[in-house]
A protein has these predicted regions:
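Amphipathic alpha-helical interaction modules
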Residues: 31-75
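Amphipathic alpha-helical binding modules
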Residues: 87-122
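Amphipathic protein-protein interaction modules
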Residues: 56-100
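Conserved phosphate/pyrophosphate-binding and hydrolysis machinery centered on Walker-type P-loop NTPases
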Residues: 18, 22, 44-52, 92-96
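N-terminal leader/targeting peptides and immediately adjacent processing regions
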Residues: 1-29
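Short leucine-rich amphipathic alpha-helices used at interfaces
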Residues: 18, 51-52, 56-59, 63-65, ...
């Protein structure tokens, strides 16, 4: 389900809708909250939030961090393990498109962590 299929998603909305249909959606939210917490950023997202709510919260958090606290933003990317070379290739001419692309990369990476942990634990 994951390794090759994750490439078929074009944006975070498509990815989140698929994840929400999966039993691991709440674990994705828990992992996101944990990763942001490790960077001392309080990401307030309920495990019962909808994919749209989650996407909006992540977009707002990332945009806020880019504009006000670049060190925490970079720390979050490091903790989540988003490749720096991919981040550097994103077009920065429009902040909203940039944020959407970064959120998509974050969600893909965290989803991989959650999926692999669920598949290979037990």
């Amino acid at each position: 389900m994951l390794p090759n299929s994750i490439k078929k998603y074009q944006n975070s909305t498509d990815l989140l809708i698929n994840i929400a249909e999966n039993d691991l959606y709440s674990k994705l939210i828990i992992q996101l909250t944990k990763d942001f917490g490790l960077a001392n950023y309080d990401l307030k997202i309920s495990e019962k939030s909808t994919p749209d709510t989650l996407k909006e919260a992540l977009n707002n958090a990332i945009k806020n961090l880019i504009l006000t606290d670049s060190n925490t933003y970079k720390t979050i990317l490091y903790i989540i393990d988003v490749p720096e070379e991919i981040i550097q290739k994103i077009d920065t001419s429009d902040i909203n498109n940039y944020v959407e692309a970064v959120v998509f990369l974050i969600l893909k990476r965290v989803w991989k962590k959650v999926w692999f942990r669920a598949k290979y634990t037990n």
